[in-house]
Amino acid sequence: MLQPIGDRVIVKVKDEEEEKVGGIVLASNAKEKPQMGEIIAVGNGKRNANGDLIPMSVAKGETVFFDKYSGTNLKYEGEKYLVLRESDLLAVVK
């Protein structure tokens, strides 16, 4: 299992579904990168200037939105993930 370090989270990006516009199937390179996913692992948090640990404000299992250009793509055991810093997250679906 993957465990992120510091203020990072590992997100399983929602699968891209083929999109049809007016009956035309869009090519995969015409689609934008998904911006929504489920958190599968959360780091311990970030340390401030005094060395105190600031805990993460998100949790495993939450669905989040993120900027389409943020994070690092990662492939592990045949699955695709995205590693993001907590500050890259835009919103949590409640």
UniProtKB/Swiss-Prot annotation:
It comes from the Bacteria. CDD domains: cpn10. It is found in: Cytoplasm. InterPro entries: Chaperonin_GroES, Chaperonin_GroES_sf, Chaprnonin_Cpn10_CS, GroES-like_sf. The keyword Chaperone applies. GO terms for molecular function: ATP binding; metal ion binding; protein folding chaperone; protein-folding chaperone binding; unfolded protein binding. Keywords: Chaperone, Cytoplasm. GO terms for biological process: chaperone cofactor-dependent protein refolding. GO terms for cellular component: cytoplasm. Belongs to the GroES chaperonin family. Heptamer of 7 subunits arranged in a ring. Interacts with the chaperonin GroEL. PANTHER family: 10 KDA HEAT SHOCK PROTEIN (PTHR10772), CO-CHAPERONIN GROES (PTHR10772:SF58). Together with the chaperonin GroEL, plays an essential role in assisting protein folding. The GroEL-GroES system forms a nano-cage that allows encapsulation of the non-native substrate proteins and provides a physical environment optimized to promote and accelerate protein folding. GroES binds to the apical surface of the GroEL ring, thereby capping the opening of the GroEL channel. This is Co-chaperonin GroES. It comes from Lactobacillus gasseri (strain ATCC 33323 / DSM 20243 / BCRC 14619 / CIP 102991 / JCM 1131 / KCTC 3163 / NCIMB 11718 / NCTC 13722 / AM63).
